[in-house]
């Protein structure tokens, strides 16, 4: 973790996703635990203060790469945090991004509680890409089978306008699918679509081997076994339908994304903006209604 000071919410987000933070080199990240000499208190205290990671607004940070070398064998990636209008850190990020052979993700916040939700998708997608790079599997585990000996997996995409669900069997064949309006509470629409799609498929809840949620409301679906970012889902889906796809553009509701894939359909890199209504279903509906146009 590097860059400008970040909130506890960001650190909690990382730790809740199983991230081991090797070091916190933000300007307020290192612990202020000073071991001073009682006989030379002032000089010892001053020495400890001057050896803290400095703010880039005050002094140029040096020897950061030497510090990171000690973690090289355990360092999978770097989350670089900046605060809005604190532009000094963007220059250091650009320099490190080009010189270090380490995956890096820069996130910018405005020190408010709301911004933590905005960066959740990109942070989780970054973590997923790092796990895949290490050979870990996203959304794969030993699955139980239904009473008929078959395996069924349910996927739920919770969007701003609609909640979509599909059940696949072990041969990746569609058994049933359904679409309902999301409404005010994504959790309630997810419960409703679960009931409807099971009825369509003629299955019971215990017949489903795995439930995976995605979309902006994925964390609001309590019965999901796993939640995966739409970035990783885009990569898997595009590669399944066309293995030659290397670039995906997603004009979404909360943000827009540009995603780069490798030959295996794995997310190599991605960029996002923070605010975008271009692909929001409700925004499009309101504009169509205002312009008196049919969709």
Give residue spans per PLM region.
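Conserved phosphate-binding catalytic cores of ATP/NTP-utilizing and phosphoryl-transfer enzymes
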Residues: 141-148, 216-262, 266
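Short acidic, glycine/serine/threonine-rich loops at helix termini
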Residues: 12, 166-169, 190, 220-225, ...
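C-terminal hydrophobic structural anchor segments
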Residues: 60-101
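Peripheral docking tails and interdomain loops at the edges
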Residues: 91-144
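Redox- and metal-dependent alpha/beta enzyme cores, enriched for Fe-S-associated oxidoreductases
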Residues: 2-67
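Glycine-rich phosphate-binding loop plus the immediately following alpha-helix
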Residues: 182-186, 268-295
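N-terminal glycine/serine-rich phosphate-binding loop of ATP-dependent small-molecule kinases
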Residues: 148-230
């Amino acid at each position: 973790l590097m860059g400008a000071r970040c909130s506890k919410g960001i650190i909690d987000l990382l730790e809740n996703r199983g991230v081991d933070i090797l070091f916190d080199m933000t300007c307020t990240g290192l612990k202020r635990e000073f071991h001073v000499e009682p006989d030379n208190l002032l000089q010892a205290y001053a020495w400890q203060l001057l050896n803290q990671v400095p703010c880039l607004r005050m002094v140029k940070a040096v020897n950061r790469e030497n510090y990171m070398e000690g973690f090289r064998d355990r360092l999978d990636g770097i989350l670089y945090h900046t605060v809005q209008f604190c532009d000094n850190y963007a220059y250091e990020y650009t320099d490190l991004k080009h010189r270090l052979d380490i995956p890096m993700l820069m996130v910018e916040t405005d020190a408010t509680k709301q911004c933590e939700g905005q960066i959740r998708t990109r942070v989780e997608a970054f973590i997923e890409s790092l796990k895949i790079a290490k050979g870990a599997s996203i959304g794969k585990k030993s699955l139980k089978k239904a009473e008929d000996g078959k395996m069924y997996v349910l996927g739920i995409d919770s969007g701003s306008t609609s909640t979509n669900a599909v059940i696949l069997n072990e041969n990746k064949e569609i058994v049933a699918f359904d679409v309902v309006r999301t409404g005010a509470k994504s959790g309630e629409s997810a419960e409703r679509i679960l009931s409807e799609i099971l009825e369509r498929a003629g299955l019971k809840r215990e017949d489903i081997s795995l439930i995976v949620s995605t979309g902006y409301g994925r964390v609001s679906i309590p019965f999901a076994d796993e939640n995966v970012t739409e970035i990783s889902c885009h990569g898997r889906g595009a590669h399944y339908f066309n293995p030659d796809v290397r670039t995906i553009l997603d004009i979404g509701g909360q943000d827009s994304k540009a995603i780069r894939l490798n030959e295996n359909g794995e997310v190599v890199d991605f960029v996002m903006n923070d605010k975008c209504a271009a692909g929001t279903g409700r925004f499009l509906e309101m504009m169509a209604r205002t312009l008196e146009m049919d969709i």
